A protein has these predicted regions:
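C-terminal halves and exits of single transmembrane alpha-helices
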Residues: 75-96
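Extramembrane terminal tails and long inter-domain/linker segments of multi-pass membrane proteins
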Residues: 1-8, 21, 191-208
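Structural signature of hydrophobic alpha-helical transmembrane segments
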Residues: 36-48, 98-112, 172-175
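N-terminal topogenic module of multi-pass integral membrane proteins
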Residues: 1-55, 59
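Short juxtamembrane and helix-loop transition motifs at transmembrane-helix boundaries
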Residues: 1-6, 27-38, 64-67, 91-102, ...
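C-terminal ends of transmembrane helices
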Residues: 52-62, 119-126, 188
Length: 208
C-alpha cells in the first residue's frame, strides 16, 4: 500500500480563484478599463477555473469533502461566467445588445452563486477565521452585483458597469475577498513549509 503523503492543494486553488476574483473586482470598481474583460475571462478560465478544478478533484482523493465542494464550485462559477461572454462571441446564441437587459439576465446568476457562497460560509464555521471571512465577503460581493444589476434594469439608467453604484461598491468588496483568498493560499504554503504559523489563519479552537 502506498503511504506517500499527498500534497495540500488548497493553496494553489485559493490563489488562483483569489487572483481571478481580484481582476474582476478591479474592473467593477472602475480601476481596470472595460477593455480588460478579455484578460479577466482568460485568467478566470485558467487561474479561476482550471486551477480550483484540479484542487477540488485532488481534494476528493484526500477525503476533504468541504475543499472538494468549494473548489469545484469555484471552477464551475468561472467556467460559467466566461461562457456567458464566449457563447455570443462564437455565434452560438443571440447576443443581448441592450446593456440593461444584459445585466438583468445575469442578476439571478450572481444571486444564486451568492447563496452558495453564503452556504460555504456557514459550512466553514469549524475552519479558520480567514476562510470564513473569505466566503462571507464573496457572498456579499455576489449579492451586491446581483442587486446592482437588478436596479440598473429597474431604473433603466445604466449603460455600463461604471454607472452602477452598487456594483462599484461590490467591486471593492470583491477586491477585499480576492486579497483574503490569496492570503489564505499563501499562508497555507508558508505555514506548511515552515511547520508553524508564520501567516496566522485564525484557527478555530475545537469544540468541547
Amino acid at each position: 500500500m502506498n503511504d506517500q503523503p499527498v500534497a495540500n492543494t488548497t493553496s494553489f486553488g485559493a490563489i488562483g480563484f483569489g487572483f481571478s476574483l481580484l481582476l474582476l473586482s478591479l474592473n467593477m470598481a472602475q480601476i481596470l478599463d472595460s477593455n480588460a474583460m478579455g484578460v479577466i475571462l482568460a485568467t478566470g478560465l485558467f487561474a479561476g477555473g482550471l486551477t480550483p478544478l484540479i484542487a477540488g478533484l485532488w481534494s476528493l482523493k484526500t477525503g476533504n469533502s468541504f475543499a472538494a465542494t468549494a473548489y469545484i464550485l469555484a471552477a464551475t462559477f468561472w467556467f460559467s461566467y466566461a461562457f456567458i461572454y464566449f457563447l455570443p462571441a462564437l455565434g452560438l446564441i443571440t447576443p443581448v445588445t441592450e446593456p440593461a437587459i444584459a445585466m438583468l439576465v445575469q442578476m439571478p446568476f450572481f444571486f444564486l452563486w451568492g447563496l452558495l457562497a453564503f452556504w460555504l460560509f456557514l459550512s466553514s464555521m469549524k475552519a479558520n477565521r480567514v476562510l470564513q471571512i473569505n466566503f462571507f465577503l464573496l457572498a456579499i460581493f455576489l449579492w451586491l452585483v446581483a442587486f446592482g444589476y437588478f436596479h440598473a434594469w429597474e431604473t433603466w439608467n445604466a449603460t455600463t458597469i461604471a454607472d452602477i453604484t452598487l456594483v462599484w461598491i461590490a467591486g471593492w468588496v470583491g477586491v477585499a475577498a480576492g486579497f483574503v483568498g490569496i492570503y489564505y493560499g499563501l499562508a497555507s504554503v508558508l505555514n506548511e513549509t515552515y511547520k508553524r504559523d508564520i501567516m496566522p489563519l485564525g484557527q478555530v479552537p475545537p469544540s468541547t
